[in-house]
Every structure is written in C-alpha cells, then in structure tokens.
Amino acid sequence: LYQNEEVRQKNMPLLKRCNDDPTIAFMTFKPYFHNESFPFIEERTQEYFGCGRISRQDADKFAANTLHIYEYFVAPVFKRGLFLGFDQRSREKIGEPYGWIRTARDQREVSQQDFYKHCEIVLQPTDTTENWPRVGFEAMASGSVLVVDNRGGWRQMVEHGKTGWLCSNERDFIYYASKMACEPNLRDDMAEAARARG
C-alpha cells in the first residue's frame, strides 16, 4: 500500500523480484485530510510579504542553500520569514537565519494555523524526497501557495503554474518566490485553484 503512484512504480519491480506471487496487489490510497482544521485565509497583511517553511525538527528537511534562496528572492515590500520546526541541528546545517526570519522550535511556539496565516507562500527547499507531504494539504487548504521541490509526492500534489510551483534548482525557487511576491493577483488565483484541487 503506497501513498503515491511515483513511489509505487519505483518500488514495485524491486519487491516483485523478492516475491513474484501474482496474487500480491500493489495499490495506492487516497489520504484523508480534515480541511476544517486549516481554514482558507483570504486576507493577509499588506505591510510585509510573509513566507516560510514548516517541518518536524530535522536538519534534512532543510536544503543547505535555504538561506541563500530566502535572501535572494525579491519582493515589493519587506519580507518576513517564519521557520517552524527549527532547532540547533537546522542551525548547524544552514546557518543563523537573517534578522527578518523568525524561528520557532515547534507548534507550542507558533501554531500551524498561525504559520499559514503568516505565509503568502510556503517556500520549502529540502534535502529529502517527500512521499506525500501533509504540509501540502495544509498549505493548499489555508491559501498559502507552495514553492517546493520538483520530486517525490509534490509532483502529484502540485500542478506546476496552476496550484503552485515545482522547482528543479535554486534559480527556480528564487524566480517563483519573486513572481509570487510581485504578482498578487496570480498568487490569489493559484491559492484558490490549490484550494479547489485539495
């Protein structure tokens, strides 16, 4: 039983070599998500452009170039970042976040709902391949546009250019984050499309 088709296709041949019994069925399932826990946020402050990333406390959940990406994307107003799930291991990997990026260890410091209320975009480069990321469901329900890696479960969850952005390299992350900061009408349209898809 697999969470997404890409992982099923990758692992099925390997497992069939271990046991080629034709009665074994390799299946995927449609996960359940409780949308009411993450209400859609139509209006966010215009005083700054809110961006962030959220995960459990694990250094691998951060790409080594995370701070470079956050620093170099442009916005017409001040940027305000929020890293939820940030601890000493994360700091040792990526360095000390800039003064405009707030860090929180876990949801006791900043709730998930407050995180999404802050974020126009979830700018989430990682060094892991996500299988079927819960963050995607939460962001899409909340109206935070996803700017994520072009691999793993993100490919099935995000429709590139319509419900979010799939990034293959550092330049993609910087470009699409900048695009979302500078094109609020497109960002709003994408947030609505993601909400409908989710």
Locate predicted features.
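Short glycine/acidic-rich beta->alpha loop that forms part of the nucleotide-sugar donor binding site
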Residues: 129-133, 140, 150
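Conserved catalytic-core segment of nucleotide-activated headgroup transferases in glycan assembly
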Residues: 5-110
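Short hydrophobic beta-strand element within catalytic cores of glycosyltransferases
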Residues: 145-148
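Short alpha-helical segment that forms part of, or immediately flanks, the ligand-binding pocket
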Residues: 113, 136-141, 155-156, 162
